Each structure stands twice: as structure tokens, then as C-alpha cells.
């Protein structure tokens, strides 16, 4: 279990995440297939294992892991629009009258309902790790929308979930730009060979660089003309590499081989033990990494009451 992306959410109040109570809460909204006339369903699934006996909360030391699954029927808008257009033309030709918006919308609804049972189904899973002592929920996603879907559903079953995205005192853009401009990152961090530069003007240009020396004259020239760094490839110690963006989203997260090898040794041959060992080691790494990252970005803005 290694996250590939990371969104960090800060609990604004202390929440007693008791595994048994959380298990019962998640069980009140299990994932299920879409019915024939449903566009989408959303619910919780076991993060590891299958079957009714698989727990919805994976507990490893002080850390908890949960997962949710979304199932949706895929109706391409072009297919629906073509069918609506065809039906409208048929009515206007046969009945010699104009079809107005209200009737057109009704026709569209009827066509969607007719197409739904035959639509393809897409399933997607999302994981979230809860670290009560650290006061954070970590979501394995680069999409704030997908993360908010999970958190709002978790809030629904728990009754309350005081949480907000983690923020820092200095805009990540300013820090990343300074690191590239000065050719030196904060202690323990290393600038790699990929970045995105944007002009600060609303319609300004965008430059994306891959496999390029970011200390070179070309990059420095872009910075001198007013562009800022909005995405930056970084490494931390000998443990992680990732892309950090201007919204504090961590993408393309990669755990270095030494960590993965350690998890394999700790986990042994059983799949369940391997899963638990990698999750535990990942969370211990995050517990060390996130405070250092926040400090490098000017320090975290801690909500009152935490």
C-alpha cells in the first residue's frame, strides 16, 4: 500500500477515531452496484481483502486506512445530444411545431433514462489514511473534488468531521520560485529536473520543462522575466520523490527502493502482512516528512483549537 498522490487535510478539532465506532459508521453506507436507473453510487469498501468479513477499517498501530468506491454509468454527452436532436427533429417535422426548451429538457431526461440500463459502468476507488495523533487525514488523490467526495461521505456517516485542507504561511509558488532561482532548496530537499513555469499575467505563457537542468540559463531567464514556478519535481532525503504544485498537491509520489525493500522484509511472505507493513512504513514516513515540508514552506497555518 503506497500512495501515488497526496492531499493533506487538517482536523480543526480533536476527533476520537475509535476503530469499532468508525467501522460501524462506514458499514451504514457500503458501496453497492448502480441500479438500472441510477447514474452513480458511492460508498465504503474494505481497503484490503474481499467478502463480507473484510473490515472497512484497516488498523495498523496508531493509523487507520479506509477506502471508498464510486460506481457510475457512462453516458457520452455526444450520444445523448444526438438522440435528443433526432427526436426533436422528428417531432417538429411530424407535428409541424417548434419544440421549446422545457419540452427539450423532458425529452433529454427520457432518453437518459432509456439509455441508462445499457450504459457502460466505471468503478474507481480512493483511499484515505487517518492519523489521529498527527491530526491529519491523508487522501491518495491529486483531485480535490474526489477527496472532498470521500470526506463529505465520511462526514455524513460520522455526523461530524471538522476538517479543512492543510495550508502554509508562504505561498508554495513563492517558495518553489525562490528554490529554483537561488538554486538551493530547504535542508533535506533536492530540486530535480522537471518544473512548470507560468507568467503571472492572466493570459500569460506557460513553460513545461522535463529532463532539464533547472539551474541553466534558460530557466533563469524565464524567472527574470517574471515567470513563477507552479510545479516542481523534488526529492526528500533518500526516501521520496514527487511533484509539488501551487495548491499543495503532491503528485507522482514515489517511495524509493530502500523503503520498499524494508517493507518487504518486515512483511514476510503473506499478502496481508505485506500490505500492513507497507502501510505502516508509509505512514511513519509521512509523519516525518509532512512537518518538514510544511516548515520548508513557511510553516503550517494551524487552525484555532488544534
Curated annotation (Swiss-Prot):
Leader sequence segment: none
Keywords recorded for this protein, A-Z: Cytoplasm, DNA recombination
Chief location: cytoplasm
Residues forming coiled coils: none
Single annotated GO MF: double-stranded DNA binding
InterPro entries: RdgC (IPR007476)
UniProt name for this protein: Recombination-associated protein RdgC
Species of origin: Pseudomonas putida (strain ATCC 47054 / DSM 6125 / CFBP 8728 / NCIMB 11950 / KT2440)
Lineage: Bacteria, Pseudomonadati, Pseudomonadota, Gammaproteobacteria, Pseudomonadales
Recorded name of the encoding gene: rdgC
